[in-house]
C-alpha cells in the first residue's frame, strides 16, 4: 500500500505529504488518517510514526479552541510571574539586572510595574515566589483537566510523547490565530473587490455638436406667397469628448471598463490589440463619436486594458487560492463533471398546442398499434446546453400537425385558414416567367425507371424495382397518387412552442412517373432560373465555398448594398391550387407528356391517410404541397423565384436574389430599401405570408440558410452558425454501444472538417470529435445516413479535408459574422483541443456541459427558429 512507503520517509517528507493532502486532496487525507488509527498500537515500531503524523495534523475541533485559549492565557501568566521573580532576584543580588528587566518587559502583559533599580525585601520575594507556585499548580490542574477532555473526545492514543498536550495546544492556538489573520485579510480583500467602481456615464463627459457633411440639400421656402429655392448644407450630429482633463480621465476609465466588460482575457499580444481596437471602433460607431475621440479612446484602451490592475491580480489570486479550489471540488461532483460524460438520452415532446377538433379530419379505431421511438441522443460534453428534442409519434402530435400544418395557420385556439390568392394572379403576372423557363430549358429526355431505382439506397431500391414490375402489368391509376403521411422525426431546438411537421409521400408507382421525368432534369431547370435572373440564383446546387463567393459577388455589385432576408411562413401549406397549376404548366410545357400531365393533375386533390398509435386519420385537401413529392423542392423554388422576379419587375429595381426554396435573401442598393416595405401585402395577393427580417448593411451579417459569409484567407465561404455545434452533437440514430457512438462522431467530424477547414472554433470542434472517435473509418453509406440533407447540400460531394491555417483576418471576419471575438475564439479552441469526448452510453437524461452557448454569443431565442 502507498501509505506504508511513508513509514521510512523523512519527517519533512511526511509533514509535506500531510499538508498537501489536507489542502488539496481531502479524501486521501481522511483515508490516511483512518489508516493511522488502524495501525496504532499494533506494532511498537509504528507507534512513533503514528504519533509524529498526528502531531502534524491540524484538523482542530471546537473543544480544542477553548482549551487552547485558556492554556495560552495561563501560560502567559506563568511566564510573566516567572520573569518578575527573576527580575527581583537579580535586583536583590545586583547581577544581571538589565537582562532580567528586558526579559520581564517583553513578557509583561501590562498592569504590572517593576522599576529598573530597586532592592526588593524578603517578604516581596516570598510573595512573588508563592504566586508563581500557585500559578504553576493551577496550570498543572488545567493540563490534567485538558488531558481528560482529550481522552474523552479523541481517545487515549491522541496525546502521546510525539504529540504532547502543550505542543498540541500551542499548535491549535497558532492555527486559530492564523485563521483570524486570514479572516481579517479576506475581509480587507473583500472590501476592495466589492467596492463600487466609479464609472461615469458616457453622456456626462461627451457633448453633441452639429457639423457640416459637405453635402447640400435644396430647401423650398415660401416668401410673399412665392416659393424660393436655395441650397443649405446637410448637418450631422457628432459626439465628442469634452475638452477638459476631468472628461478625458472619465473617458479613459469608461472605455477601459467597457472593453474589459466585453472580454476580460485580453492582453498585449497582436490579436488582443486588434480585438481592443475593433471594440473601440464598434463603440465609436454606436455612439457616433468623432474621429479624434475614437483615436483617443483607442490609445487609452490599448495601454490600459492589457495591463492588469492590483484589483485584477488580487481577483486572480483569490480565484486560484487553495481554499477556492477546495470549495470548487464538491461542485464538480454535483455538476457531474467526469463520470456523466458520454452519450445521454432525451425523450420526445408533446406539442403544447390544443386540438381544434376540425371536422375535416376523421379519426377511426382498429389500426395496428404502432410504437415508434422518439428519443434523441446527445454528447453531454459538447451540446452547449442547447435542448433538442424530437416529437413523439402520438395521436395528439399527429392531430396538431394536420390541423396546424395542413388546414390552419393560427397559433391560438381558433381555426384561422391560409389566405387565398387573387383570381388568376399567377397567370396574369407570371406567365412571362413560365414561358422563359420553358424556353431556356428546351428539350428534356425521360430517363429509364431502372436508373431511378438504382439512385436510391438498398432498402428503397428494392421497393422501386417492385413498383417497376407492377407498372408493367398494371398501368398507373389515380389511387397511386393517394398519400400516406407520417410525423417527421427531426431535431427541434426547444426555444418556442412547436407544431410537428408531416411527411406526405405517395406510392412508389407514382414516384416513378414523376421521377423519370423530373428528378434527373432538376439541375437543368434550376439553371434556367439562373438564366432568367441573369446570375446564379438558386444556390442549393452549390457547396458552401461556391455559395460564399457567389453571395460576395452579388454584394459587390452595389455601391451601398443592403440585404433583406425573406422567409415564407410554412410555404408548403400556402401553395394553392392556382400555384400548383402554374408550376405544372412549366413541366407540361417542357415534356409535353400526357402520362406526366395526368400524374401532376392528381397533385391538385389529395386523399391522405395517416396511421398513429392504434388510430387511422383520414382527410382530403385541394392544393397544398405534399412534402414527400419528388417535385417538392424544385416546385417551391420555381414558385418563389417566379414571384420574386415578378415583384422586382413591378418595382422596377435592380436587385439580386439568393434562393433555396422558401428561404430567400434580396440584395439591392440601399436607396431601394424603402421600395420593399410593401412586400407583405404584395405576396399576400399570391396567398403567401411573407416574413421579412431586419435589413443588414454588412456582408458578414447576411444570413442565408442558417449560415453567414466569413472571409477565410481572403475568400468568402458560407459558415454555419455556432449553434450548429449543439445540433451536430445530437443524433436521432439508435446507438447500441461505444463503437456506434465513435462511428457517429467520425462521420459528423469528417464532413464538418471538409466544410470548416480554417474556420475559427468549428474546425477545432470537428477535430475534437474526429480525435475522440479514434479516427475511425466509416463507409460512405453510413456518412449519408448520419448527416442531414442540408449538410449534404453544402458538401455537394466533397469529402477531402484541406488543412487551412486560421489567420487573424479570418478571426476578425468570424467576429463580424457571429459576435465571438478572437480571444474568446482562442479560449474555446484550446478547450476543444484538450477535450476527449467520451463515447460511454449514459442512462441519465440531463447534464450541464463545460462549454455553454452563452460564450459563443448564441441567443436563447433565435429569429430563424421556425414555428
Swiss-Prot record:
It catalyses: RNA(n) + a ribonucleoside 5'-triphosphate = RNA(n+1) + diphosphate. Gene3D superfamilies: 3.30.70.270. CDD domains: Luteovirus_RdRp. InterPro entries: DNA/RNA_pol_sf, Luteo_Rpol_P1-P2, Rev_trsase/Diguanyl_cyclase, RNA-dir_pol_PSvirus, RNA_pol_HCV. Keywords: Nucleotide-binding, Nucleotidyltransferase, RNA-directed RNA polymerase, Transferase, Viral RNA replication. The keyword Protease does not apply. Residues 561-676 form the RdRp catalytic domain. GO terms for molecular function: nucleotide binding; RNA binding; RNA-directed RNA polymerase activity. The keyword Transferase applies. It holds the Pfam family RdRP_3. GO terms for biological process: viral RNA genome replication; viral translational frameshifting. Its EC number is 2.7.7.48. Transmembrane segments: none annotated. Probable polymerase. Belongs to the luteoviruses RNA polymerase family. This is Putative RNA-directed RNA polymerase. The lineage of its organism: Viruses, Riboviria, Orthornavirae, Kitrinoviricota, Tolucaviricetes.
Amino acid at each position: 500500500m502507498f501509505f506504508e512507503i511513508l513509514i521510512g520517509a523523512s519527517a519533512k517528507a511526511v509533514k509535506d505529504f500531510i499538508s498537501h493532502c489536507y489542502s488539496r486532496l481531502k479524501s486521501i487525507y481522511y483515508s490516511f488518517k483512518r489508516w493511522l488509527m488502524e495501525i496504532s498500537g499494533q506494532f511498537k515500531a509504528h507507534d512513533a510514526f503514528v504519533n509524529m503524523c498526528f502531531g502534524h495534523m491540524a484538523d482542530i475541533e471546537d473543544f480544542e479552541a477553548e482549551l487552547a485559549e485558556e492554556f495560552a492565557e495561563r501560560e502567559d501568566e506563568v511566564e510573566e510571574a516567572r520573569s518578575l521573580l527573576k527580575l527581583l532576584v537579580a535586583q536583590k543580588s545586583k547581577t544581571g539586572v538589565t537582562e532580567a528587566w528586558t526579559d520581564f518587559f517583553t513578557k509583561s502583559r501590562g498592569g504590572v510595574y517593576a522599576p529598573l533599580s530597586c532592592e526588593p525585601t524578603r517578604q516581596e520575594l516570598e510573595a512573588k515566589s508563592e504566586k508563581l507556585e500557585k500559578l504553576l499548580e493551577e496550570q498543572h490542574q488545567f493540563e490534567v483537566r485538558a488531558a481528560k477532555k482529550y481522552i474523552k473526545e479523541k481517545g487515549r492514543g491522541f496525546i502521546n510523547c510525539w504529540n504532547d498536550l502543550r505542543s498540541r495546544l500551542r499548535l491549535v492556538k497558532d492555527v486559530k490565530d492564523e485563521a483570524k489573520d486570514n479572516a481579517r485579510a479576506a475581509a480587507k480583500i473583500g472590501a476592495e473587490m466589492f467596492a463600487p467602481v466609479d464609472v461615469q456615464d458616457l453622456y456626462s463627459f461627451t457633448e453633441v455638436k452639429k457639423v457640416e457633411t459637405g453635402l447640400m440639400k435644396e430647401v423650398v421656402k415660401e416668401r410673399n406667397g412665392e416659393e424660393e429655392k436655395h441650397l443649405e448644407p446637410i448637418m450631422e450630429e457628432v459626439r465628442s469628448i469634452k475638452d477638459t482633463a476631468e472628461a478625458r480621465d472619465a473617458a479613459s476609465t469608461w472605455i477601459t471598463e467597457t472593453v474589459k466588460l466585453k472580454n476580460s482575457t485580453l492582453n498585449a499580444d497582436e490579436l488582443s490589440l486588434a480585438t481592443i481596437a475593433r471594440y473601440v471602433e464598434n463603440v465609436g460607431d454606436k455612439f457616433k463619436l468623432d474621429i479624434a475621440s475614437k483615436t483617443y479612446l483607442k490609445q487609452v484602451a490599448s495601454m490600459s486594458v492589457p495591463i492588469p490592475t492590483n484589483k485584477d491580480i488580487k481577483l486572480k489570486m483569490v480565484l486560484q487560492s487553495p481554499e477556492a479550489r477546495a470549495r470548487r471540488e464538491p461542485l464538480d461532483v454535483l455538476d457531474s463533471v467526469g463520470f456523466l460524460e458520454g452519450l445521454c438520452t432525451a425523450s420526445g415532446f408533446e406539442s403544447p398546442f390544443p386540438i381544434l377538433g376540425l371536422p375535416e379530419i376523421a379519426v377511426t379505431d382498429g389500426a395496428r398499434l404502432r410504437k415508434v421511438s422518439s428519443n434523441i441522443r446527445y454528447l453531454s460534453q459538447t451540446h452547449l446546453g442547447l435542448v433538442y428534442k424530437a416529437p413523439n409519434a402520438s395521436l395528439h402530435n399527429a392531430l396538431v400537425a394536420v390541423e396546424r400544418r395542413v388546414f390552419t395557420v393560427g397559433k391560438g385556439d381558433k381555426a384561422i385558414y391560409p389566405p387565398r390568392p387573387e383570381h388568376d394572379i399567377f397567370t396574369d403576372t407570371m406567365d412571362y416567367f413560365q414561358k422563359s423557363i420553358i424556353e431556356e430549358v428546351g428539350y428534356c429526355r425521360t430517363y429509364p425507371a431502372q436508373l431511378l431505382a438504382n439512385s436510391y439506397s438498398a432498402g428503397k431500391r428494392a421497393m422501386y424495382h417492385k413498383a417497376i414490375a407492377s407498372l408493367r402489368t398494371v398501368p398507373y391509376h389515380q389511387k397511386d397518387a393517394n398519400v400516406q403521411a407520417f410525423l417527421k422525426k427531426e431535431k427541434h431546438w426547444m426555444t418556442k412552442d412547436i407544431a410537428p411537421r408531416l411527411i406526405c409521400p405517395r406510392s412508389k408507382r407514382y414516384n416513378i412517373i414523376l421521377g423519370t421525368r423530373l428528378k434527373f432534369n432538376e439541375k437543368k431547370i434550376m439553371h434556367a432560373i439562373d438564366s432568367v435572373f441573369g446570375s446564379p440564383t438558386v444556390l442549393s446546387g452549390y457547396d458552401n465555398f461556391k455559395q460564399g463567393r457567389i453571395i460576395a459577388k452579388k454584394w459587390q455589385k452595389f455601391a451601398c448594398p443592403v440585404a433583406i432576408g425573406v422567409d415564407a411562413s410554412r410555404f408548403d401549406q400556402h401553395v394553392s391550387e392556382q400555384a400548383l397549376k402554374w408550376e405544372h404548366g412549366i413541366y407540361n410545357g417542357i415534356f409535353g407528356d400526357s402520362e406526366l400531365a395526368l400524374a401532376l393533375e392528381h397533385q391538385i386533390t389529395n386523399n391522405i391517410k395517416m396511421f398513429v398509435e392504434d388510430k387511422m386519420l383520414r382527410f382530403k385537401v385541394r392544393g397544398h404541397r405534399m412534402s414527400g413529392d419528388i417535385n417538392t423542392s424544385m416546385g417551391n423554388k420555381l414558385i418563389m423565384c417566379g414571384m420574386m422576379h415578378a415583384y422586382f419587375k413591378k418595382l422596377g429595381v435592380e436587385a439580386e436574389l439568393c434562393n433555396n426554396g422558401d428561404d430567400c435573401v434580396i440584395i439591392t442598393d440601399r436607396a431601394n430599401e424603402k421600395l420593399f416595405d410593401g412586400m407583405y401585402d404584395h405576396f399576400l395577393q399570391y396567398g403567401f405570408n411573407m416574413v421579412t427580417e431586419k435589413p443588414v448593411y454588412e456582408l458578414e451579417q447576411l444570413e442565408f440558410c442558417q449560415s453567414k459569409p466569413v472571409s477565410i484567407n481572403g475568400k468568402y465561404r458560407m459558415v454555419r452558425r455556432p449553434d450548429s455545434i449543439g445540433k451536430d452533437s445530437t443524433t436521432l440514430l439508435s446507438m447500441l454501444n461505444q463503437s456506434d457512438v465513435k462511428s457517429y462522431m467520425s462521420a459528423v467530424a469528417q464532413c464538418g472538417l471538409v466544410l470548416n477547414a480554417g474556420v475559427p472554433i468549428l474546425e477545432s470542434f470537428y477535430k475534437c470529435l474526429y480525435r475522440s472517435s479514434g479516427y475511425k473509418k466509416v463507409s460512405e453509406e453510413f456518412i449519408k445516413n448520419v448527416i442531414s440533407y442540408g449538410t449534404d447540400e453544402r458538401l455537394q460531394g466533397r469529402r477531402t479535408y484541406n488543412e487551412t491555417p486560421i489567420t487573424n483576418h479570418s478571426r476578425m471576419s468570424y467576429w463580424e459574422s457571429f459576435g465571438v471575438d478572437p480571444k474568446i475564439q482562442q479560449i474555446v479552441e484550446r478547450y476543444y483541443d484538450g477535450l476527449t469526448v467520451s463515447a460511454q452510453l449514459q442512462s441519465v437524461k440531463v447534464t450541464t456541459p463545460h462549454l455553454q452557448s452563452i460564450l459563443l454569443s448564441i441567443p436563447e431565442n433565435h429569429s430563424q427558429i421556425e414555428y
